[in-house]
Amino acid sequence: MKKRIALLPGDGIGPEVLDAAVDVLKSVAEHYQHEFEFEYGLIGGAAIDEAGAPLPEETVAACKAADAILLGAVGGPKWDQNPSELRPEKGLLAIRKQLDLFANLRPVKVFESLAGASPLKTEYIEGVDFVIVRELTGGLYFGKPSEQYVNQNGEEEAVDTLFYKKSEMERVIREAFQMAQSRKGKVTSVDKANVLESSKLWRKTAEEVAKEFPDVKLEHMLVDNAAMQLIYAPGQFDIIVTENMFGDILSDEASMLTGSLGMLPSASLSSSGLHLYEPVHGSAPDIAGQNIANPLAAILSAAMMLRTSFGLEAEAQAVEHAVDQVLRAGKRTKDLAKGSEHCTTQSITGEVKAALADDNAISNIMTAYV
């Protein structure tokens, strides 16, 4: 199989973890006889510094010419004082809008070998395996007006607008139900319908979509209760679907169930089939360039790409199994090591590649005896 992948390293540790993912993808290509072409593009602070904009047109063109997109991370204090249109995060928001990346999938799965790294007791997180489906292109982050100004009395004021079309709600909720059909068959729709008009429409829309999926159970949960339940009883969830800002907050909360943001991959899906994959963690500029960043979320994001965009289920499982084998062997990056000896970014990437090669060799031997 031949595929073109757009690579957007971004800022901070983004280039380091993306390099790790690319190294693993090259190993996959070698072991499974695929050909992956890589084209780099600028985004975020790096794009502001070099091209004067957080999302250059050349980057958008490179993405549209690709079969899938891998992103590192964007942002950092270096650009905090820039005007809003020259903030790194604007590049991420813009690419979501331009490519119509409407649904963000964030799997939350606790690796058995990492249960001790979670801040929660093992009995609370045992068997946790759910996905947060977050709407990406509407809501408070995109609604207009959104501005700061001085009123007639000389006092500073600010306004943001929470705006949604029903069609934007429908498509992401439908995506959640379709996913639930191949999992445990349960969707938890999270809103604030006791206060917000947009949430009342969200809840109504979820009820309507649910009628298309009689084999899937729908439950509604207010966002404040959902935040509590994620800590109190995370094992109850299968698919959580929610609007943009609620999903942004809840997914970061849920990420700590695994013990580190460095373990969580994500996918942003478009209606066109051109999807973007990225680790959940941020750019972590304080550790950039030190070879200590955890690349496993980026590597697992690449595995999601293999499965979702390319239909390469065996290859995706091989990467995930290699990561699991490395963790079971006790290999840890600094964020997971809790003061003990730890692996560097490059060394744990090498461990994953070695486990992938071993797994492939065993598969070849087994095939020879069939």
UniProtKB/Swiss-Prot annotation:
UniProt keyword annotation of Membrane present: no
Function statement: Catalyzes the oxidation of 3-carboxy-2-hydroxy-4-methylpentanoate (3-isopropylmalate) to 3-carboxy-4-methyl-2-oxopentanoate. The product decarboxylates to 4-methyl-2 oxopentanoate.
Name the record gives this protein: 3-isopropylmalate dehydrogenase
Note accompanying the cofactor annotation: Binds 1 Mg(2+) or Mn(2+) ion per subunit.
GO terms for biological process, alphabetical: L-leucine biosynthetic process
Pfam families xref list: Iso_dh
Main location group: cytoplasm
Pathway: Amino-acid biosynthesis; L-leucine biosynthesis; L-leucine from 3-methyl-2-oxobutanoate: step 3/4
